[in-house]
Structures are given as C-alpha cells and as structure tokens.
Amino acid sequence: MDRKSSGGCSIMFKSGFIGIIGRPNVGKSTLLNGILGEKLAIITHKPQTTRNRIMGIRNADNAQFIFVDTPGIHSASTPLNRLMVRTATETFTDSDILLLVVEAGQAVHPEDLPIIESLKESGTISFLILNKIDLIRKEQLLPLMDAYRNLHSFAELIPISALTGEGIPLLLDELWKYLPEGPQYFPDDMMTDQSERFLAAEIIREKILLLTHKEIPYSSAVVVDAFKEDEARNLIRISATINVEKESQKGIIIGKKGTMLKEIGTRARVDMEKFFATRIFLELFVRVRKDWTKDPRMLREFGYNE
C-alpha cells in the first residue's frame, strides 16, 4: 500500500492490529494511554479493572497503529471473569502483533508461562514489554530479559515505563518494522471505535473502583441510559445506572446521606468534562440486579457478550 508524497514519490504505508496482553495489573492500560498521549482506558490499582477490549488508534505519516487493550488473563471462576479471559485470548489470533506486558521488577511469574505457551501456539509475532523499569535498578533487567528470552523467541524485548513514557518511542519504531503493508482503516481524527456512552460508563466505573472496596467494584456494572448533547448550551446531559448484586452493596454505593454516590458523580463529571471538552450534567441511579455476574442474560444486557 503506497501513498504519494508531495514530490510525487510513492511512500509505503503500513497498518495493523496490535494486541496488548498479560496478567492483571501489569500496566497494559497505562501503556495504551501512554502510546496515545491521552487517557482512554481507565486505570486503577485494582486487578481486573479492564473488562472489555478497548481499541486505541495512533496515526503516523506512514502508518496506522491500531492497539487493542485487553482484560488481564487470570484464573476465572464466574461467567463474567470467563468472558473477560476469552475476550483477551481471542486477541491472540486477531492481531498482527502481540505485546506481552510483564513487570520488570519481578522474576518470571508462573502465570506468565501459560500465556507464553499460547503465544507459541498462535504463531503471531510477539514482543515482550518489560514495564515499570522506573521502579527497578538497571542491573536487575538483563537477567530477567535472558530468562524470558529462554522461554520464547520474542521478536523484540523492550524495557519501558508506561507511566513516564520511557521506551515508548523505541517501541513504536520497532513496531513499524514489523507492521504489514496495508490501508488506513480509520480516519485521522478517530482515536477509538468505542462509543461515547461506553467511555462515559467506564469513567463512572473507574470512580467506583477507586472509591469502594472488597467485592463492591467487581459487583458493579454501569449502564448509560441517556447521552444527550445540548449544543446551544455547550452541555452534555448524561443519565447512568450503577447496577449491583445486593441491597447491601447498593447502600454502600449510595453512602450515608448519599455522600458516596455524590463523590462518585463529582469525580466522574470532572473527568468527563476534560475528556469531552464540554460541560457535563450527570445524574446517577443505583439498582440491584441480583447475581448479575453469573447471569448470561444480564451479562449480555450490560455489554459483556458471550
């Protein structure tokens, strides 16, 4: 696939899908945000924050990098968790390149081993991304790289800090070398294929993850019921429902005299106004949907498709 330069010469154009995979909490979503230069995927300190595949598009003069952030691969016990893991593993065959993200400060983690075996079986070009190098001494890095190199013939091993951005320019340069020639799949001004409703729901869910504890974050699903733009008033009106599994969880989400729900809404509104670059009117409701994480019908209703 060629493009014409201003001088009339053909310039090779490359494009491809790049899956970001790994265990929970290794920095996959932080990496996606760092690559895009904007916060698209929600980030918390809790494992299993990401539930859906999130596509982020990075354009260059001669390439389009289409990154796919995935849920962390883990031992799944509920239908929701099994769907999350399946969403991640489908990326093995849907991608042109796979980025296995691991923590640079640790020895080879036992849970990385089955992921590496799946990489081998897929035959997909794969990079090892050693994240969080800002937290370790440099002399710790080479032995860990050698250990992973002995497990699989990765095309490239690249140390990075997704948080500080160190190593991301090198990663993009190396990815370009392996991208296939192809068309521009998405327009220049498109950063993701996700809807505004989905992104608003994710911002709300991030605040629930950050402000609540124990089972509450994992028992909550956010559905945006209304998303209406009022251009005359430079305003978006959003109405959303937080679905939980038990009455006791509903009480915690609402909080004493509604204080927790108000805090969730305030923090979400501030982030939405930054992301959508306009004023936001946000109203939140809380509803009990008993055992929704185990009910295939409700999982589909909340966007977690089987």
Curated annotation (Swiss-Prot):
Entry keywords, A to Z: Cell inner membrane, Cell membrane, Cytoplasm, GTP-binding, Membrane, Nucleotide-binding, Ribosome biogenesis, RNA-binding, rRNA-binding
Region G1, residue ranges: 22-29
GO annotation terms (biological process): ribosomal small subunit assembly
Region (G5): 160-162
InterPro entries: G_ERA_dom, GTP-bd, GTPase_Era-like, KH_dom-like_a/b, KH_dom_type_2, KH_sf_prok-type, P-loop_NTPase, Small_GTP-bd
Domain KH type-2, residue spans: 212-290
Example of a GO cellular component annotation carried by this entry: cytosol
Region described as G2: 48-52
Domain of life, source organism: Bacteria
Domain named Era-type G: residues: 14-181
Residues involved in GTP binding: 22-29, 69-73, 131-134
Region (G3) location: 69-72
GO molecular function: GTP binding; GTPase activity; ribosomal small subunit binding; small ribosomal subunit rRNA binding
Region annotation (G4) ranges: 131-134
Subcellular location per the Swiss-Prot or TrEMBL entry: Cytoplasm; Cell inner membrane
Family annotation (Pfam families): KH_2 (PF07650), MMR_HSR1 (PF01926)
Main location: cytoplasm
Annotated membrane topology: Peripheral membrane protein
Subunit annotation: Monomer.
Family: Belongs to the TRAFAC class TrmE-Era-EngA-EngB-Septin-like GTPase superfamily. Era GTPase family.
Known function: An essential GTPase that binds both GDP and GTP, with rapid nucleotide exchange. Plays a role in 16S rRNA processing and 30S ribosomal subunit biogenesis and possibly also in cell cycle regulation and energy metabolism.
NCBIfam families with a match to the protein in the record: era, PRK00089.1, small_GTP
Protein name: GTPase Era
Organism the protein comes from: Syntrophus aciditrophicus (strain SB)
